């Protein structure tokens, strides 16, 4: 595939994402979580509100010491960020007028519920000529229904539409 074509396609997707940003569904709040909001004045969270920052295994920033790492009290699993922390970062970005960055944090928050292996499968499926439109739409439905990842599902549906327009689906090459 020609690099100019790839660059053009990426620019088109980004342009459409920017134009749809106001229409994109907001990330669903975490089940049982709080919908705390943060402002620019709360940044950086680690300094101003360390009590707000917890890992997926409920560890706090104070738990991350060299001693705890060396004694295996802190593992790689403990390093995973939570959707709540990502949503706080998104609200800070929105407050700062950085809507595109906020959208990225919200998408990342949704993806914390998706297993790593599934994310890699989706990544590969989104590469040009790897999937049919139906396969991409099935991925979008899966993201929305199984993982409540509405923003990511909309992104995959948009990609499916662009791939139809640009003839980048499986069998088009």
Curated annotation (Swiss-Prot):
It is found in: Bacterial microcompartment. It holds the Pfam family Dehydratase_SU. The keyword Ligase does not apply. Its EC number is 4.2.1.28. Keywords: Bacterial microcompartment, Cobalamin, Cobalt, Lyase. GO terms for cellular component: propanediol degradation polyhedral organelle. Inhibited by glycerol. InterPro entries: Ppandiol/glycerol_DeHydtase_su, Prodiol/glycerol_DeHase__sf_su. Part of the PduCDE complex that catalyzes the dehydration of 1,2-propanediol (1,2-PD) to propionaldehyde. Required for S.typhimurium growth on 1,2-PD as the sole carbon and energy source. Localized in the bacterial microcompartment (BMC) dedicated to 1,2-PD degradation. This is Propanediol dehydratase small subunit. The lineage of its organism: Bacteria, Pseudomonadati, Pseudomonadota, Gammaproteobacteria, Enterobacterales.
């Amino acid at each position: 595939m020609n690099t100019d074509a790839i660059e053009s396609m990426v620019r088109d997707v980004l342009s459409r994402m920017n134009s749809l940003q106001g229409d994109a569904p907001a990330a669903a709040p975490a089940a049982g979580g709080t919908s705390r909001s943060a402002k620019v004045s709360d940044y950086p969270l680690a300094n101003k509100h360390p009590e707000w920052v917890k890992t997926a295994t409920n560890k706090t920033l104070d738990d991350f010491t060299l001693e705890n790492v060396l004694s295996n009290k802190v593992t790689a699993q403990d390093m995973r960020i939570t959707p709540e922390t990502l949503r706080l970062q998104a609200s800070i970005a929105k407050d700062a007028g950085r809507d595109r960055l906020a959208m990225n944090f919200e998408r990342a928050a949704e993806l914390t519920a998706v297993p790593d292996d599934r994310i890699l499968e989706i990544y590969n499926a989104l590469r040009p000529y790897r999937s049919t439109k139906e396969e991409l739409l099935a991925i979008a439905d899966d993201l929305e229904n199984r993982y409540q990842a509405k923003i990511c599902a909309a992104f995959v549906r948009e990609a499916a539409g662009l791939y139809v327009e640009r003839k980048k689906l499986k069998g088009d090459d």
